[in-house]
Amino acid sequence: MTDRKKDHIDLAFKSKTGLEEIDRRFFYEPLMAKHPVAGLASFKFLGKTMRAPIWVSSMTGGTQLAGQINHNLAKVCREFGLGMGLGSCRPILQNDEHFPDFDLRDTIGDDLPFYANLGIAQLEDMVLNDDISPIDRLIEKLRADGLIIHVNPLQEWLQPEGNLFSQPPVDTIRTYLEMTNYPVIVKEVGQGMGPESLRALLELPLEAIEMAAFGGTNFAKVELLRSDDFKQQYFGPVSHIGHDAFEMTDLINEILDENITVKCKQIIISGGISSFLDGYYLINRCKLPAIYGQASGFLKYASQSYDELEKFVEYQVEGIKLANAYFVIKDSER
């Protein structure tokens, strides 16, 4: 007791907060709940039962460290009941050399969502050739629940080795949905999406849309950093165009108020989600069932040690429990 009181005195002057620091997204209701003790309530998402509203967003797919990182991620998903999207599976589409790095079903278990991932450029080639059998084999071999399609026109344009699209991605996606029976998620890669793209996807029978919004890892910028100085200077402003997760959530809500037939009814809110408070706020603001995803945060800790990764997820889950008890989101703007 004496030590605690001494700490309070020593730290009091360091703990003053300014009005500019207040988080105006929430009402704080300290009288209305007891401290949360039990775990989060389980819920259905992507056809599986999850125990926390957190998604491991697709990351790197073909590096020397990918195997250990991926297995750490799958292990933590199983421990806490999260879902997971693999990084690009292109390295194992035709060659099994790196397959063990992606073979995670036994690690994550059968009860949680686990998705393969390919770029729209690879999908376009197969759709135009009327042969998606390599994708079917990939999903079956991985025992994945379905496919994430990452749509990345700016990245492909800026990438020296990039593939230029011969038709609008929405046409490729629409045709692929007619050819496959597997669930499909569509995501961007760090720019987010505007209203016309979101509207088009909401009208398709997708399992979910993942935002991959502006504010997180930006793969257009990644490609610029790989290029020469002149290209970086000339095309640099392109990487600053996009939509953050807050804007995209409101765009989706506005589209839902329109008189359209919505077939895609689940959202993974990702891109710039720096804390559990960001995720909690946006999944509660969204009118569709939603969870939140992170990529770089998981990558950081998964590449260090499992203990660090476990603590990272544990604190997020505890934070969501705290938020459920005491924080109510405001309808007003930030």
Spans of model-derived segments:
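Alpha-helix-loop-beta-strand connector modules within alpha/beta enzyme cores
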Residues: 99-117, 165-185, 230-263, 316-319
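Hydrophobic faces of well-ordered beta-strands that scaffold small-molecule active sites
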Residues: 54-57, 82-88, 114-118, 145, ...
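Catalytic cores of alpha/beta
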Residues: 129-137, 191-211, 251-263, 269, ...
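Active-site beta->alpha loop and helix N-cap motifs at the rims of alpha/beta catalytic domains
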Residues: 58-60, 67, 82-167
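Glycine/Thr-rich beta-alpha phosphate-binding loop at enzyme active sites
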Residues: 143-171, 197-198, 204-254, 297
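N-terminal functional module of multi-domain proteins
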Residues: 29-91
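An N-cap/entry alpha-helix motif that binds or orients negatively charged groups
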Residues: 1-46, 50
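Alpha/beta catalytic cores of nucleotide-metabolism and tRNA/nucleoside-modifying enzymes
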Residues: 1-18, 232-265, 274-334
